Amino acid sequence: MSSDAIRNTEQINAAIKIIENKTERPQSSTTPIDSKASTVAAANSTATETSRDLTQYTLDDGRVVSTNRRIMNKVPAITSHVPTDEELFQPNGIPRHEFLRDHFKREGKLSAAQAARIVTLATELFSKEPNLISVPAPITVCGDIHGQYFDLLKLFEVGGDPATTSYLFLGDYVDRGSFSFECLIYLYSLKLNFNDHFWLLRGNHECKHLTSYFTFKNEMLHKYNLDIYEKCCESFNNLPLAALMNGQYLCVHGGISPELNSLQDINNLNRFREIPSHGLMCDLLWADPIEEYDEVLDKDLTEEDIVNSKTMVPHHGKMAPSRDMFVPNSVRGCSYAFTYRAACHFLQETGLLSIIRAHEAQDAGYRMYKNTKTLGFPSLLTLFSAPNYLDTYNNKAAILKYENNVMNIRQFNMTPHPYWLPDFMDVFTWSLPFVGEKVTEMLVAILNICTEDELENDTPVIEELVGTDKKLPQAGKSEATPQPATSASPKHASILDDEHRRKALRNKILAVAKVSRMYSVLREETNKVQFLKDHNSGVLPRGALSNGVKGLDEALSTFERARKHDLINEKLPPSLDELKNENKKYYEKVWQKVHEHDAKNDSK
């Protein structure tokens, strides 16, 4: 046994014997209790348990509530009903989209077989569509949804009934939000019902790589099973990549590519696969305009310059994208960021009017970029249809209604939705670090009933004190009341003499203490999940302007601050092996913090 272990054992032995010989301490005087709190305590007192109405309970604020009814009765109750096939499907096998909409609104679930059936039907339908679909006007174009089901319902209220309104969605239906499955299945059911005027494109999040890294896979494992998740990923591989709207607009999730010279290049792709990390397919789903897209860098750019621009130029003996048109996309970690010159060149070559895309959160829900020189029309338009993205951005959502050659942008705000804990944890899993930490604090408090002075090695030998009426110092006091040796019962004496029990007790307490310190670290990490939500107050901290860059960052708008902190999640996630290494490093870091905490305490 190490010297530290021996010392700790001796201290625990001394503490146990001192506790055995202490007199019962007088109860400390209590402070006056607030009259209102006294009333509440009296109302809930167990003294009147026999006559108490157990169907009524008095809260701390004095309100009396019923114990057999929901307190928040204004919030619709979650339905536990799993629909039958007759309720869910029409005689022709197509799902009843109105029933599904209302069922999901009450957080209802489907059976695994029903979910698989809808996904399989949608996959078969997508597989028959070309990479580049043609959609006529009038039409309503929508951007990212990201699992915000209740906002999706609001979108249809603003945009019009899907039964009578044509829709084109630009991808990113899943991840980040807590209702990705509901969004996906409801959109798939609308596609199955209205195939002639309802279209869905693929976004960069519609792939196994991103959904495994973000929230969709965890959601599917929590709500259903791995088989349904795999079927959803298969359906993603069948989604079309782009749309030609009214023969004038290229609609795509991400942007253009140096490899995109004609629209036929899109149809030449093999899309039935996982999204690659480079190439034309990657760029269509991942590309962004550069940050300086609207800045007047091309004021002298002529139509001839645009026509003569080259997307690919010789570089070190091989062809590479022109730096005037495409630069590596450092924000995403893959694909390219394209310039105004690149967009104008593409529109000139294809004869199109503009590019409509999604992929980036916008404070107003949309952004129109610099006009083309030839037609004076916005060369690029970004749409984002997830309001208050991540419950943090405080942004508006927008959709585009296009009819009779007129564009009409409609904005809407977020809709309240049910709350889920991060990673779909239940309340017990969420609270375990807190409970573990508090339990160990209680154990430590029990051990700390004796002062350090009482446990010092130079304290009179405990064996000499047992059986005498010698005064023992009380914890936190210079004197102690005498305690007759006869107060110790034979049972207690036998326990105190059991060396193995004392050592086992000590080892258990130290082990729990170490686990508790790990819980403490994990609790801090758990709290960081809510870090972005702390930025929602909108209040500038005192002294922010005097704190340099950090203070100025805090003075930014809610949207900009949230976007800045969430920027790391806009990148292409690491591979599975890289993720395993990151998790390994994370837990090594947790244990390192625990060991550092131990070393710090030992040095005191």
Curated annotation (Swiss-Prot):
- Superkingdom of origin: Eukaryota
Please list the residues that make up the active site. Answer: 205 (proton donor)
Q: Name one GO cellular component term.
A: cytoplasm
Question: Where are the compositionally biased (Low complexity) regions?
Answer: 35-48
The chain residues annotated with the modification Phosphoserine are 489, 520
* Enzyme Commission no: 3.1.3.16
Record's SMART domains?
PP2Ac (SM00156)
Copy out the cofactor comment. Answer: Binds 1 Fe(3+) ion per subunit. Binds 1 zinc ion per subunit.
Which Cys pairs does UniProt list as disulfide-bonded? none
Q: Which reaction does it catalyse?
A: O-phospho-L-seryl-[protein] + H2O = L-seryl-[protein] + phosphate; O-phospho-L-threonyl-[protein] + H2O = L-threonyl-[protein] + phosphate
Query: What segment(s) does the record annotate as region Calmodulin-binding?
Result: 501-523
Recite the UniProt keywords alphabetically: Calmodulin-binding, Hydrolase, Iron, Metal-binding, Phosphoprotein, Protein phosphatase, Zinc
Alphabetical list of Gene3D superfamilies matching this protein: 3.60.21.10
Any keyword Phosphoprotein? Answer: yes
Top enzyme class:
hydrolase
What residues does Zn(2+) bind to?
Answer: 172, 204, 253, 359
Specify residue ranges for compositional bias: Polar residues: 480-489
What remark does the entry add?
Answer: Present with 7110 molecules/cell in log phase SD medium.
According to its UniProt entry, the function of this protein is described as: Calcium-dependent, calmodulin-stimulated protein phosphatase. This subunit may have a role in the calmodulin activation of calcineurin.
What family does the entry list?
Belongs to the PPP phosphatase family. PP-2B subfamily.
Q: Can you state the subunit structure given in the record?
A: Composed of two components (A and B), the A component is the catalytic subunit and the B component confers calcium sensitivity.
What's the protein called, per UniProt? Serine/threonine-protein phosphatase 2B catalytic subunit A2
Q: Which organism is it from?
A: Saccharomyces cerevisiae (strain ATCC 204508 / S288c) (Baker's yeast)
- Lineage, opening ranks: Eukaryota, Fungi, Dikarya, Ascomycota, Saccharomycotina
The encoding gene = CMP2
